[in-house]
Amino acid sequence: MSAADVVRIETLGEGALLLHFGEHIDAACNARVQAAAMRLRRANLAGIVDIVPAYASLLLRFDVLNWQRDSSLASALAAIDSESTDAVEIGRLHEIPVCYGGSHGPDISDLAAHAKLSTDEVIALHCGAEYRVAMLGFAPGFPYLLGLDAALHAPRRASPRTRVPAGSVAIGGAQTGIYPRELPGGWQLIGRTPRVLFDVQRETPALLAPGDRVRFYAIDEKEFNSLLAAQG
């Protein structure tokens, strides 16, 4: 079955299309989205000014003065359908240090109790997986990561916090993520990284991009403070 047969197309005003690849959050669907985004960037189709992948959809923004809807859409679908998802480039691997528990991860004990695990087991499971950045959203640079061990799936907090520190590593449902700056949030906080996830002064402000891979490793408070100080 071709991409044109399975992709649902939604028009968003005069200058954008939203391509729907599925209705559920799963790695296979997101792999199709990432593959489509990669192929469209490679195709360099006239009139496309932005390509924004999400969990199960892909936003295409167009220069309304430089595209013909029918021909441009046909070209886009042909590019999407040109290869299998096996051809997706492997994203960059980021190894992210995390200080787990304590004041940096105030919810880790409750999450461990929910999972019927010790906190050490929670940390081992969280560090033992390789995650894929499915999308950025909620706030600039906030990565939604797929690959969380099912034993760590946990509901969001009943009462969201009004302030979550920058760098907080959290779990919400079947996802894990990192708060790029101080924000309100309702995910379960299990640790904090000293890495800066988003900085407008960098050439590429967001540290992570859709399709990138992430592995976490545990550090202690002393190393956390040292790494934090080293970043100025």
Question: Where are the regions that the model predicts?
Answer:
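Glycine-rich active-site loops that engage anionic ligands at enzyme catalytic sites
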Residues: 2-232
